[in-house]
Amino acid sequence: MYKKVLVPLDGSALAECTLSHVKNLFKDGSLGEVTLLNVVKFDFPWARMRSEQDIKHIDLDAIREPFFVKSKKYLADLESQLVSEGMKVKTESLEGNRPADTITEYAQEKGMDMIIIGTHGYTGLKKLMVGSVAFGVLHQSHIPVLLIRPESCRP
């Protein structure tokens, strides 16, 4: 039923715990493909500069590159773990200042059947019922969203 599943990850242990759920849900081989997505967010003062004059001396590509290198390495490491367990995996690093928007747009554009996302990621604000990115994805998505709570990740 779910042939294309999107798993957004932000580098946190809580986000990565979703992978154990993906493995358990699809251990029977019913999953066609999982896509691991990392949204690289740039929220630097120069990112908000409006005029070309403001940023003409800043090489934005040189600033972005290390973030994408780190993102791609992170996803490649996770990909190799899943591939070694027999899963078909794709990875994607995308730039986006609003991760929930980037995730839902990507899911729609790529025809994903489901999104599996941790409720609390990098910020890990435990007092919130659902983290802001997961909340945004849940409310914007037109495909099923499986939320993974941090409590389900404890050994």
Where are these regions (language model features)?
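Aromatic/pi-system hotspot detector in well-structured domains
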Residues: 2, 22, 31, 36, ...
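Small/aliphatic-rich secondary-structure junction motif
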Residues: 1-58, 83-85
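A short acidic, glycine-rich active-site loop
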Residues: 56-73
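Gly/Ser-rich helix-loop-strand patches that form or flank binding pockets
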Residues: 4, 13, 105-155
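General small-molecule cofactor/ligand-binding pocket signal
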Residues: 35-37, 90-94, 146
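Active-site loop/turn elements of alpha/beta-hydrolase fold enzymes
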Residues: 39-41, 96, 150
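Short, well-ordered secondary-structure micro-motifs
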Residues: 18, 46-49, 101-104, 127-128
